[in-house]
Amino acid sequence: MKVLIVNKFLHPNGGSETYIFEVGKQLQKMGHQVEYFGMEHEGRVVSNRLDCYTGNMDFHTGKLQKLLYPFRILYSTEAAKKIRKVLDDLQPDVVHVNNFNFQLTPSILYAIRKYEKQTGRTVRIVYTAHDSQLVCPNHLMQRPSGELCQECLGQKQWNCTKHKCIHNSRVKSLLGSVEAKIYQHNHAYRMFDTVIC
């Protein structure tokens, strides 16, 4: 089986990266072909045959980045184009999606489904939920005070803005709420065939 593992970071950065490296290693031990797609980074430790990755995006630096932030978190044309190249080359049976929001965006999901339609191939999209992104714009189900919160459940993502849940910022929380509503409206997360929690 051919598996493409997608994660925004392809270098040691946290728990999801430890997870994808181990899953990939175990799949390879079982004889599966595994490649990776995400952002380029000088510390990248996994790859795909084409060495095709998106540019490294860090929203915490640079004034230009901050101006482009609202647009780049919603849809990445770069990610859509580059994952398509990797899909055409690898022709995966499964795409295992992990952390992708903000940098890679659901544009990759649309690109995978478009690839299926154009090639006639069936690709299963498996998503591992490393956080609460699908139901909570700030990923944590927690207010800035640390108080646990479930107010966004039931498609009520505007509560994120009301409580300034993302970095205690009304603007960032509004962007998170808008992002969640757009993906809800476009059924982006319904493109997953399987969700692992």
Segments predicted by a language model, with ranges:
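A short helix->loop->beta-strand "cap" motif at the edges of active sites that frequently abuts
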Residues: 115-125
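Short aromatic-enriched loop/helix-cap "lid" or pocket-rim segments at secondary-structure transitions
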Residues: 17-18, 45-50, 108-109, 136-142, ...
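N-terminal strand-loop element at the rim of the active site
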Residues: 7-13, 20, 24-77, 81-90
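A short, histidine- and acid-enriched strand-loop-helix "catalytic/donor-clamping" loop
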Residues: 102-103, 123, 129-139, 168-171
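Membrane-proximal helix-turn-helix segments that form the acceptor-binding/catalytic region
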Residues: 114, 133, 142, 148-194
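Short N-terminal targeting/anchoring amphipathic segment
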Residues: 84-104, 123-128
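Extreme N-terminal starter segment of soluble prokaryotic enzymes
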Residues: 1-3
